[in-house]
Amino acid sequence: MFTFKNYYYLYIENSKVLNFNLIKTRNKFNIIYRNIGKPENITQLKKFRQKCKQKAIGFFIANNIDLCTKLKADGLYVSAYSKKILNPRGFNMRLKIIGSAHNLKELGLKKKQGCKIIIFSRLFKTNYKNKSDFLGIV
């Protein structure tokens, strides 16, 4: 989970893990749906999207413009591993584009990709294997 100016971004991998009754505050939470494993049923995701609208929760799809437009999501999340420059004419202009970056090079790429909000991660030293660098507070 990341926080940005009193907004909270929750990463989920399937629509069954979130209990909407636990979210009491409106217009502060955003869900980023990343489908890494088994693909979900579109009708189930549409129901999940509808619940997000009812609770005033922002709904973003990770790295999938087609799914983003099918579900009429609030926006697109571009992960740090996505290096492709987006063509804004290819999708609805009202979509918010957010992204994540792990270093200054990726930060520049996210700006080129049109991200309005960039989640800058790994600010502090961690003990993760193969991830020894950290940025510090910028």
Q: Predicted segments — roles?
A:
Residues Q113-V138:
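Active-site/ligand-binding-proximal alpha/beta "capping" segment
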Residues M1-K84, G90-K116:
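Conserved N-terminal beta1-alpha1 strand-loop-helix module at the mouth
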